[in-house]
Design a protein with these regions (language model features):
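Extracellular/periplasmic catalytic domains that process cell-envelope and extracellular macromolecules
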Residues: 35-40, 61-65, 83, 110-113
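Short pre-active-site segment immediately N-terminal to the catalytic Zn-binding motif
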Residues: 66-85
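Short, well-ordered secondary-structure micro-motifs within conserved domains or adaptor modules
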Residues: 38-53
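Solvent-exposed loop/turn segments at secondary-structure junctions
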Residues: 49-54, 76-79, 97-99, 124-126
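Active-site recognition of the HExxH zinc-binding catalytic motif
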Residues: 82-97
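Catalytic zinc-binding patch centered on the HExxH motif and its immediate surroundings
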Residues: 49-67, 108-109
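Propeptide-to-catalytic entry region of secreted or membrane-anchored zinc metalloproteases
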Residues: 1-38
Length: 158
């Protein structure tokens, strides 16, 4: 998460989640089974009740095969499927396509041409969710790179 001072930022240390995952699951076995099945990456989804902002964690190092997405569920709320999709897609390379992660011009371009793009927000109605060509390309689901992608690729997300 970007703003630690925000009231939406979770006070729970990210490493706590990683430790809990390692305690609850045989991560080495998960990696082995996934790789044997021909998977490039595995994702773990955590739903935590409480205040916070949903986010994805990219593991680095020896176990970079595993990625985690943490999703906060406020008490008695309905979690939208788009939040799950949005956070999970980060683990496979998708970028946030909203401000401040993108310029206002880029956000407006996506809103105009791909209004259902899930990386704009995970809070859109499920039936309207879609993936833009940029998101498909970032995740490696297509090799077709369009010229307009250049405006979205930054030093931080290369």
């Amino acid at each position: 998460p970007d703003d630690i001072d925000s009231p939406n930022y979770s006070s729970i240390d990210v490493n706590t989640y990683l430790e809990l995952i390692d305690e609850q699951f045989d991560i080495e076995k998960l990696v082995s089974v996934g790789k044997d099945a021909g998977c490039d990456k595995a994702a773990v989804l955590i739903i935590a009740e409480g205040k916070g902002r949903s986010f994805a964690i990219h593991r680095t190092g020896e176990l970079d095969f595993i990625g985690e997405a943490v999703i906060y569920e406020p008490h008695n709320s309905e979690l939208q499927a788009g939040v799950f999709v949005h956070e999970m897609l980060h683990l496979f390379g998708a970028d946030d396509l909203y401000h401040p992660h993108q310029s206002e011009e880029n956000v407006e371009f996506i809103k105009e041409h791909y209004p259902g793009e899930v990386m704009l927000s995970g809070h859109a109605p499920t039936e309207s969710l879609a993936l833009s060509p940029y998101t498909l390309w970032r995740m490696g689901w297509t090799d077709e790179r369009e010229e307009w992608f250049d405006a979205f690729v930054t030093e931080a997300n290369q």
